[in-house]
Swiss-Prot record:
Protein's UniProt keywords contain Repeat: yes
Ranges occupied by Kelch repeats: 295-342, 343-389, 391-454
Protein name: Kelch repeat and BTB domain-containing protein 2
Cited SUPFAM superfamilies: Kelch motif (SSF117281), POZ domain (SSF54695)
GO biological process terms on file: symbiont-mediated perturbation of host ubiquitin-like protein modification
Database matches in PROSITE patterns: BTB (PS50097)
Amino acid sequence: MDIKNDIRNISNLLDDDILCDVIITIGDGEEIKAHKTILAAGSTYFKTMFTTPMIARDLVTRVNLQMFDKDVVKNIVQYLYNRHISSMNVIDVLKCADYLLINDLVTNCESYIKDYINHDIYHKLYEMVHIPIVKYIKRMLISNIPTLITTNAFKKTVFEILFDIISTNDSVYLYREGYKVTILLKWLEYNYITEEQLLCILSCIDIQNLDKKSRLLLYSNKTINMHPSCIQFLLDNKQNRNIIPHQLCLACHDTNYNVCNPCIVVYNINTMEYSVISTIPNHIINYASAIVDNDIIIARGYNFNNPSLNKVYKINIENKIHVELPPIIKNRCRFSLAVIDDTIYAIGGQNGTNVERTIECYTMGDDKWKMLPNMPIALSSYGMCVLDQYIYIIGGRTQHIDYTSVHTVNSIDMEEDTNISNKVMRYDTVNNIWETLPNFWTGTINPGVVSHKDDIYVVCDIKDEKNVKTCIFRYNTNTYNGWELVTTTESRLSALHTILYNNTIMMLHCYESYMLQDTFNVYTREWNHMCHQHSNSYIMYNILPIY
């Protein structure tokens, strides 16, 4: 049986106007003669129409499709005869195919869009609320907002789409309040908005729980200040809680056992008390971790039974529920996770006997990770922090080191630390490029790195001829004047876990059964040392601010 020949014969019926019993009126009053049986075989719309008793009695049926581009209709009718369609605007084809309920053509268009879609047509597809692809497009649009807001397409986004993005309460698409402000203010740069519309948008933002920077940007916006009702709304929703973190998440290893037994501890900074809230799956070490909203993300690492674990877990801090997320593409340990808005970045690290240059990212709600441009050099055990759209990387190891036991995983041996980098670079998450910054004073591994306003602070141990000092360096991201030594103190000779809160750099050390807490105020430049003994013995592996 020659299928190609049969299709050719059917197509000839259309070309020769033989036995036609339907006339389709298209743009400019032009007419296409076709056959009911063939149209009904490929289109549910035509099948339903032609089997309606009143129309079924007609010898010749007329159909009006002047609402669509005439060339698109011609191509789609041709498709129903020979299953082939010429290269055309996929959006126009999709609109018409969806209207005519040609399911296989709609599916083909959806597949094409998923493979080749770009930011310039996101907003056009988003407005096609009646077609199945829209749900996918909405997810793609929202998950790519960090890039989309830098494009011309975002400038043309209509208010209804902006409102849909900011007002969504779907956990897959949910944004932090501060990032909602970023999206809104960027859109306001290019678009007119009525007072009623603006008030409607502001009501979708939790003003009381905004970070200080976002609140200042919102309060100082010229468009918002033009509307009295919007100003009053902001005043009526003053911040009513202290956003300074007072509890931390500590990922620990219980030293009562000779095997890895990691657990998660919530530690209160003010009372220096802690409580175990969960265990970590698979008894892994040298994993990376991060906080996204109220969830702890645990990624990769290894254990001694399986050095190639690729699992990623999300652990809710309140209900303790563990959920497995899509696995990271590259095997990694001794790396870090950076979080910007709802996107997690996994950078470098050690992969077997190799050190990685690769970076990949995952947006909460997606079904997989995706690769991004490589780092300039391969690094593991580096220091990292986030400031605005940038991920800063300081120091790190350039060569592989053997796997170590949990008891020494965080120890620092200054004599054995060779092949250590003094490079400083940052990754621009909007433009997807790496930039090189002034080198650090010396090579360093696992330095504590925090950001404060426009400054990057690095806390690390540096050995001189006599002893080891804990040093704090500062780099201003506006002046680019290089690194300034801010202060030094006697080293505790232990791994440093560093965070910043209330204008204070805090370093936690764990030694035997003691929790050591050192703080340095970036304004007064005063040190404060505290020591607290706890009942059990833990090796603290990582530290993350919760609230």
